[in-house]
Amino acid sequence: MQDPGHLQGPPLALDPPRRQRQERTVYTESQQKVLEFYFQKDQYPNYDQRLNLAEMLSLREQQLQVWFKNRRAKLARERRLQQQPQRVPGQRGRGARAAPLVPVAAASFPGGPEFPQGRGSWISPQPGPWGVLPAAEPKIYSLPRTWGGPECGTQEGLKAVPAPGPGPIPAPIPGPAQIPGPVPGPAPNLGPMSGPLSVSIPGPIPAPISCPGPIPDPVLGRTLMPGPGSLPTPAPGALWPQSPYASNLSPDTQLYPDFTKLLPLLDRFEESSLSTTTSQYKEEDGFVDKNHSVPRSLLDL
């Protein structure tokens, strides 16, 4: 029989041993003074120099190699800090901004707006310690009297408008107002309706027809009545479309009575007697002559 150990693979490799941390070397004051003295002479000593110095200080050569390496890094860090500008005390961290090196100059005249670098410059406000910009404070700027003149009624001071700060977002503007409909109310009582209403569309109203008066006859001296054939016939009305609500009257129906049937025909004898009586009456009164021309009172003048 085969050994079951041969069927299995090689044993799993164990975790590599961790590198032990080197203990921190503690130097005495006398050792530090000697190392500093040699560092001022040469910052990069070679192997032989380090070996001789290690025997003199009772140290290992590897310890001196690490000390010189750390001392060179410390010197480079100090030089880098000296080249950077000074920071405002109280602001620490990578996000802190450098303080302005140039102080803010005073205004040219009191009471006017402040322009540190000139009239065309602008200084942005510095944020607070929590990164919030301070609120704008209203200021009063006074203008000189010569600007507006003595006769002009200029104001003594103009109040600056503060910058808009953070505030609530205004509500959306409402849409166009709807026009309200008619106010519902009680409908007027029209009373009981006996039947369906018949709406009649009126036709064109004809003009009033005037009956012609008696026509005087210049030969016989009497008046003549016009016959039925001499009356003007009315024009036919416009045809209207048929509607179920229209009345039964047709457009051709005459809306006025026939005056010829109402007036009886006068005989010639009655006409002659009527005209003779009228002429005699005028002659007796003395106002109009037989020819009915003009009054006599006007001729005497």
Curated annotation (Swiss-Prot):
GO biological process, one term: regulation of transcription by RNA polymerase II
Biased composition (Basic and acidic residues): 16-26, 281-292
Cell cycle is among the record's keywords: no
Name of the featured protein: Tetrapeptide repeat homeobox protein 2
Gene Ontology cellular component list: nucleoplasm; nucleus
Residue pairs linked by disulfide bridges in the UniProt entry: none
DNA-binding region: 20-79
Region of interest (Disordered), residue spans: 1-27, 273-301
GO molecular function: DNA-binding transcription factor activity, RNA polymerase II-specific; RNA polymerase II cis-regulatory region sequence-specific DNA binding
One Pfam family this sequence matches: Homeodomain
Compartments where located: Nucleus
Free-text function comment from the UniProt entry: Transcription factor expressed after fertilization required for zygotic genome activation (ZGA), a critical event in early embryonic development during which the developmental control passes from maternally provided mRNAs to the expression of the zygotic genome after fertilization. Binds and activates expression of key ZGA marker genes, such as NANOGNB, ZSCAN4, DUXB, KLF5 and DPPA3. Binds to regulatory DNA sequences containing a 5'-TAATCC-3' sequence motif.
Family of this protein: Belongs to the paired homeobox family.
